[in-house]
A protein has these predicted regions:
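NUDIX/MutT-family hydrolases
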Residues: 102, 112-145
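Active-site-adjacent beta-strand/loop module that shapes the phosphate/pyrophosphate-binding cleft
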Residues: 87-111, 145
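A structural signal for short, well-ordered beta-strand segments
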Residues: 24-26, 83, 100-103
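Conserved hydrophobic "DFG−1" position in protein kinase catalytic cores
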Residues: 28-29, 37, 103, 123
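Conserved N-terminal beta-strand and adjoining loop/helix that marks the start
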Residues: 2-35, 55, 86
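A generic structural micro-feature
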Residues: 16-20, 48, 92-97, 115-118
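A short coil-to-beta-strand element that immediately follows conserved catalytic motifs
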Residues: 77-85
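Conserved Nudix-box catalytic region and its N-terminal flanking loop in Nudix hydrolases
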Residues: 34-72
């Protein structure tokens, strides 16, 4: 029996890769060490608390995107700092590639107001983080990155 060429044999259909959507999240702590959170109005995460963030628009840097998202969702002005971590989250027909950046409050206003995709916004301390319905893995991930005080 002649040798078969390499690659002959049973074949499995190629699984198309899901599109990847670049996203950002903002890790913003106030002077009291509380984390800025928004309650999501829309999917994914509707009704759950998470850090402000969203999709990176074409032509935007990560810093520009996170500063824009925080302002749209909370009315606050922040300055983007260094990335603190990166996660991938499977979505409905897409994979979200999320880079979370540490951000600092930069001037007025200092009280957040919900807007855009947020139906509520708050600064949460450690006790709040334990009782709020946050997006899956949020608190554990941020703690694992050392992004939360205490």
């Amino acid at each position: 029996m002649p040798a078969s060429p390499a690659g002959d044999g049973p074949r499995t259909p190629a699984v198309p890769a899901l599109p990847v959507q670049a996203c950002v999240g903002a890790v913003v702590l106030d002077d009291a060490g509380r984390l800025l959170l928004v309650r999501r109005r829309n999917a994914p995460g509707r009704g759950l608390w998470s850090v402000p963030g969203g999709r990176v628009e074409p032509g935007e840097s990560l810093a520009e995107a996170v500063e824009r998202e925080v302002h749209e969702e909370t009315g606050l002005v922040v300055r983007a700092g260094e990335p603190v971590g990166r996660i991938t989250i499977p979505g409905n027909g897409v994979v979200y590639d999320v880079v979370d950046l540490v951000c600092t409050l930069s001037g007025a206003p200092t009280e957040p107001v919900p807007g855009d995709d947020a139906d509520a916004v708050t600064f949460a301390d450690a006790a709040d983080l334990d009782r709020l319905a946050c997006t899956p893995g949020l608190v554990a991930t941020l703690r694992g990155w050392g992004a939360l005080p205490g």
